[in-house]
Amino acid sequence: MGKNFLLEIGTEEMPAHFIDPAIRQMYDFSLEYFKNKKISLESVKIWATPRRLVVYIENLGEKQEAQEEEIRGPAAHIGYKDGMWTEVAKRFVEQYGASLEDLHIEETPKGKYIFLRKVKEGMNTLEILPDYITSLLKSIRFPKMMKWGDVDFYFGRPIRWIVALYGDTEIEVEIAGVKSSRYSRPPRFLPQIPIEIRDADSYLNVMRENYIIVDQEERKNEILKQINKIANENSFILDYEDDLLKEVNYLVEYPTALLGEFDKKYLALPEVVLIITMEKKQRYFPLRDADGNLTNKFIVIRNGTDNYKDIVIQGNEKVLKARLSDAEYYYHEDTKHPLEKYTEKLSGIIFQEQLGTIKDKVERVRILVREIANILGLSSEENKILERSVNLYKADLGTLMVSEYPELHGIMGRIYAKISGEKDPIPEVIGEYIYPRTLDDRLPSNFLASILGIADRIDSLTGYFALDLFPTGSEDPIGLRRISGGLLRLLLESSLKLNLRNLFVKSFEIYNFGEKYPLSQIDKGMGFIGQRLRNLLLDRYSIDIVDAVMEVGYDEMWRLKRRLDFISKFKEKESYEKLKKALNRLYRILPKDFTPKEVSENLLSSPFEKKLYEDYLKIKNEIFNDILEGNYEVLLSYDFLNEFSDDIEKFFDNVLVMSPNEDERINRLSLLSLIKLLFWEILDWSRLS
């Protein structure tokens, strides 16, 4: 029978975004550790607050399982003679503290040997737990690690106390100069009297009694209960991002929801400014009325009880008023001038130290946009809209509002463009080029915004690729993963017929690096893009489909997307298995570096190879142009594939491909190679499961 185990790591306040990754790591490590140590357990629970990381293991076994091991001893003919164990065998068992009854003889590849079957008793869990605690804390990786004082230990934030209990027994361990005990600490809003934890079983209740809700799910539900109660009692509608709830949950240990308000005059500001100020700057929950209009009310989550709540509300209202007053000033100052005026400031804003200013970037993007427009054959009106949009799309970076609220770039550009009287759809293009900002964000509704977004991201990535600023491990300070993710979604879902590699090469030319940076950096960049693309596609398609399609190239995302959609549907058809099997047979026989020649009909002697050649010509004439155009779905209704698959099988069953006659052999290999190349236009069939 096991006991419950408790480990509480008390720290200084941990940034909210550090906590979820730590929870996952602690859970995985704990399961793996005790599995490897062969100690049974019922469940592992990881709880967290801003100041505590907690492992709670239910019914952790009191000792390791006994392990049976076999030790090979001397050869049987030495240790066992005339039905008796020899002195050699006796010395062998004495060496391991065993008896002759534990010996047996087994046949091995090297002959018969004596083996000792020994049961190794498991260690007590109490002896193992100090190592578990130390190993666990050393294993956790945070987005940023820190060292404090003169201790040689790295963690997300300084460790201040450790509680470690197995049942009611203290586990003695010292980490980063902190010795474990059974005493936790109260929240900061209470007198700092240590909290005694008598045993692991009583932990949650003792913490609740001291105004600490350790379980993040319980805490989140408490927040939801309270904010919904306030909203319902006042006939308001809650409207907030999911990330806000997650962040607030990791900012408090004992949540209390309070209703505050601000001056109605600030409702004249753009709604997005109010929401960003409340959600991002202050972590408040905005409230709407029954008609969906934003109100001048908000909910703040206090870390503590409702004692002195009026003072707390007034303090939060005062802080919000100051922020909104600043925003009002920025807005009024910004709107004194048309948006175009702020383009003058772009030459003073650095894009990247070695890649120039934002103005330099705009000029590069302008050339790239013209190139894309030419490739796509845009109309003169569409070209004019794009030209004007390029002029203005970074202008809001020169405004006061975006200087204070960088996350509003593009969004304020759209608002200011409308106020400045820019004609539709220019404000829309300016405001939407930023999307998607994350992998699950929305896409632009206007394809011209997609073009601008593609050009902007291509320019950024080309510069970073040239400078070799690739992410290392989990670190990605420039945000290459985010930028490339947005680019890939635009290319995959916009269906614009563009070649990604060619755009990178063109962008590289526009930068005019000269001999400073090699063009080969684009190859390295495409490798990085390929890995990002594969990860993105694996969320939607099976691994064999993704690898089969990517193997034939991913320069043209529109083709890749069509190939993926085609094979996903084709897999459901009866002809799929036959064609895959036939083509795989063909793939296996072709030498890797074989270069096909033109097939000579005069050398086709067998009726089976003649028929296969006719099949090849038929497919080439009837649907190959469709395949080249990316119309792969024509194959879904192409009934000839069944007959073609049968003819490949008949060819292999009746024709000697590797003929002793060299001309005949090369001719047959050339026919097979041409068939492979024809279907290679779609995917690598050998990778399909």
From Swiss-Prot:
Keywords: Aminoacyl-tRNA synthetase, ATP-binding, Cytoplasm, Ligase, Nucleotide-binding, Protein biosynthesis. One of its GO terms (cellular component) is cytosol. One of its GO terms (molecular function) is ATP binding. Pfam families: DALR_1, tRNA_synt_2f. InterPro entries: DALR_anticod-bd, Gly-tRNA-synth_bsu, Gly-tRNA-synth_heterodimer. It comes from the Bacteria. It is found in: Cytoplasm. Tetramer of two alpha and two beta subunits. NCBIfam families: glyS. This is Glycine--tRNA ligase beta subunit. It comes from Dictyoglomus thermophilum (strain ATCC 35947 / DSM 3960 / H-6-12). The gene is glyS.
